[in-house]
Regions:
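Two-component/phosphorelay signaling modules centered on CheY-like receiver
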Residues: 10-34
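Acidic, metal-coordinating helix/loop segments flanking the phosphotransfer/catalytic sites
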Residues: 31-55, 63
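Hydrophobic beta-strand core positions in alpha/beta domains
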Residues: 57, 93-94
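Conserved phosphotransfer microenvironments
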Residues: 52-88
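Conserved acidic carboxylate
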Residues: 7-8, 96
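Conserved acidic residues
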Residues: 54, 107-110
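CheY-like receiver
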Residues: 122-127, 131-147
């Protein structure tokens, strides 16, 4: 499974990776750590058929730029840019330390707490993604036989 994580906090990122490794066997992770780098990366993937991400996980608040300490509600920009430039069909999870009410199109949300494991949350998300993927495969097979 190929997962793209947009997260500025190293400690939180390490915890996320640890918990993802516990629930995903064949895991490849690519990380971006600020809003502008993510937006530029997404733009570079536009019209690129090599995009093979299975899940995007993004923080809700993070610095706009690498050397900035001012946090912005970046999830809105990240999600909209990803959907416009990369893929409308890849599931998106907002993983935030703060309760959030992001008014945009995401599939999953996880409230991050440093003392709580995310394994159960990630396991449910991965199971749901796999179930939906299997359902799509079944639909394609049925369409072949119906023709």
């Amino acid at each position: 499974m190929n997962i793209l994580i947009v997260e500025d906090d190293d400690y939180k990122y390490k915890n996320m990776v640890r918990d993802l490794k516990a629930v995903v066997e064949d895991l490849n992770i690519f990380r971006l750590n600020n809003c502008m780098d993510a937006l530029m990366y997404f733009r570079s993937l536009k019209n690129n058929s090599d995009n093979d991400y299975d899940l995007l996980i993004t923080d809700n608040y993070m610095p706009l730029r690498k050397d900035s300490f001012d946090l912005v509600q970046s999830a809105i920009y990240i999600i909209n840019s990803f959907k416009n430039d990369v893929s409308e069909s890849v599931p998106i999870c907002v993983c935030s330390s703060d309760k959030f009410n992001v008014k945009c199109d995401y599939d999953y949300s996880v409230l991050y707490e440093p003392t709580k494991s995310l394994q159960e949350d990630f396991s449910k998300i991965i199971d749901d993604i796999n179930r939906k993927e299997n359902d799509l495969k079944d639909e394609k097979i049925l369409k072949i036989y119906i023709k």
